């Protein structure tokens, strides 16, 4: 994964590393690493904006994005102090929006003109359900313009190591409109595995494939009309970079790293 590698840079707080993306330079933001565990957004936001308020949700691998105001108006998830959703959009200054991840893709978005920001949790289920395009639709409904948005797809499990069943690869791939329009599954498989930077890769194990979920999200954005220059894809793999990131696929434990962005 090479596109936009130069847009990503390491920063540190008291020797603990975190990532930032040049596309999101106007906003305080961070893709925090495992070094910050077990700190929660309420603490992490103080590093980005001491005046900021943290907003988070109970992530459920769905396709719902709430505004910060809607978070306070939405019933809580069972056994949680937060409502169920997988995306948050700010609707006032100094709002930090946060997502947790440990292989799924953390997506941070900023609107250069409208000033609003978003954080999205996009695993394979949310990607299949097109949570990122649905969040973009919500930006547009709030008055944003596509050309003003900047999107960073943060550290996640890389396609080269993410083994999945065939039905998962195909159903996630079918969330790309160009794939969905093809008449047969054979044509869809061919498109997904032979296009430039293919999101579906072969696996040494029979009846298994490798799936690049970030690439699927990138393709969804490009189909909406985003320019390549509006999207940055992190060249970091949570599974392979054990010293920096938690990975559920690697350890099957529940530690997470947080990613957040603050409106201004």
Curated annotation (Swiss-Prot):
Assigned EC number: 2.4.2.1, 3.5.4.4, 2.4.2.28
Any Pfam family matching the protein: Cu-oxidase_4
Record SUPFAM superfamilies: CNF1/YfiH-like putative cysteine hydrolases (SSF64438)
Annotated InterPro entries: Cu_polyphenol_OxRdtase (IPR003730), Cu_polyphenol_OxRdtase_sf (IPR038371), Cytotoxic_necrot_fac-like_cat (IPR011324)
CDD domains: YfiH
Binding site for Zn(2+): 61, 104, 121
Reaction(s) the record says it catalyses: adenosine + phosphate = alpha-D-ribose 1-phosphate + adenine; S-methyl-5'-thioadenosine + phosphate = 5-(methylsulfanyl)-alpha-D-ribose 1-phosphate + adenine; inosine + phosphate = alpha-D-ribose 1-phosphate + hypoxanthine; adenosine + H2O + H(+) = inosine + NH4(+)
Cofactor annotation: Cu(2+); Zn(2+)
GO MF terms, alphabetically ordered: adenosine deaminase activity; copper ion binding; oxidoreductase activity; S-methyl-5-thioadenosine phosphorylase activity
Keyword line: Copper, Hydrolase, Metal-binding, Oxidoreductase, Transferase, Zinc
Signal sequence annotation: none
PANTHER family (UniProt xref): PURINE NUCLEOSIDE PHOSPHORYLASE LACC1 (PTHR30616:SF2), UNCHARACTERIZED PROTEIN YFIH (PTHR30616)
Physiological role: Purine nucleoside enzyme that catalyzes the phosphorolysis of adenosine and inosine nucleosides, yielding D-ribose 1-phosphate and the respective free bases, adenine and hypoxanthine. Also catalyzes the phosphorolysis of S-methyl-5'-thioadenosine into adenine and S-methyl-5-thio-alpha-D-ribose 1-phosphate. Also has adenosine deaminase activity.
Subunit architecture: Homodimer.
Family as reported in the entry's similarity comment: Belongs to the purine nucleoside phosphorylase YfiH/LACC1 family.
Protein's name according to its UniProt entry: Purine nucleoside phosphorylase slr1573
Source organism of the structure: Synechocystis sp. (strain ATCC 27184 / PCC 6803 / Kazusa)
